[in-house]
């Protein structure tokens, strides 16, 4: 109906027993988003039902109902123990190329019946893939993602009810270095252990109402696997000859595996993940397969992306297939590594994945890395275009904006902007998906409004701003990169000498993101909660620069 407007709303929240937890009453308002909850404190691990009723200026009403579930809201909710592998990463002066093999963790357990409800809470030091009885728990990538780990480590919640069965079951976690042990992060991790570690807690409800809990403890076992190294910048080395079949399945014989050590890492930095996960958002076929003037095989996917290549392989045992990624070719059409040695930061950013064949047919994609690329040089085999797929990776977000004109040049410009946003919103907002992959604050200062008009970035920015608050120092200084990675304090100090206060590691063109980004969120979405959440951080930054 033309000229229809909301005149009032009523929001109620009840627990599963039907008890009313919150009733806003009828509120005369046109507000329809970011309504603050003003009820009693919610309980951990509880499902709540909410109902919203709205009325318009024509006397019509509409009602909708849904639910949400709380996670572990208190440190005391954790019964699981942190456990780590007996190996350690290389300490001392960090540098590219000092990766360690990924670790396989597993725990076998028995259930008296098939559960009617099962929730698994999990996180790690590194990045992980989670398995239940041989199957992935979900499609997310690079969990628990990039945060200020000492103060803010996300855990993820999984509904694994359908993946469990009566009798023998197994939890498997495949853990790589990720951001946690990446050489970019090591200088800021002095208080943390240089080892892969896991934490998981499985809470089960049986049909008779009884409950059970399976936790990570000294009964978790670990082993090396086929991923001999995995780095977010250098790439992944996978030897299929070292695969351990069915390692994440029930009844696998793990007697030769090593028992894990308990680690006293604590729970004070654990927070349920805010926002959507990193996933594969699109897949691209090979646009063109060519042989370069140098005689090298080049895959062209027709578009610069952030992601990785999935390939089908069927080559003799011991064949080493290498995939090297780049964004442009040289003038002659040869492979060109456009980021190597760029200002020193490109050193070791090989963007190279290696797969060693075991003589069987297989489909491979990297587990713990991603690249910025359009072109891929393939060595070790004569490739077929149909065997390769580019997997576009980004944080999952709802699309909001569109733009179309009669001028195809403008349309292409907007399309390029959207591809750039997709490639640079992966866990944190980055400057580029290949060389630095860093959360430069100045980039989001100038782009946040556009990003919010294109996609629903509310949860994505909320998490990043919480990282910013964690990285803010006692003087109110906001670092130029958030989370503050190891390579960038010195670079920030250099840039601050050029653009800001000498040696402070910050500058108004970057640190102002502490104010501009949350205010942009408020302007675009009407979200006042983000202003309340970030006010102290905003105020301290303003006090510092004044």
Positions of PLM-derived features:
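Well-ordered alpha-helical scaffold segments within catalytic/enzyme domains
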Residues: 446-457, 513-530
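Extended, well-ordered alpha-helical scaffold segments
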Residues: 413, 457-468, 528-545
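Extracellular/oxidizing-compartment recognition motifs
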Residues: 1-435, 442-443, 457-462, 475, ...
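Charged catalytic carboxylate motif
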Residues: 416, 446, 460, 513, ...
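Short alpha-helical scaffolding segments that buttress acidic/His motifs in well-ordered protein cores
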Residues: 420, 447-448, 464-468
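Amphipathic, well-ordered alpha-helical segments in soluble domains
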Residues: 443, 464, 510-517, 541
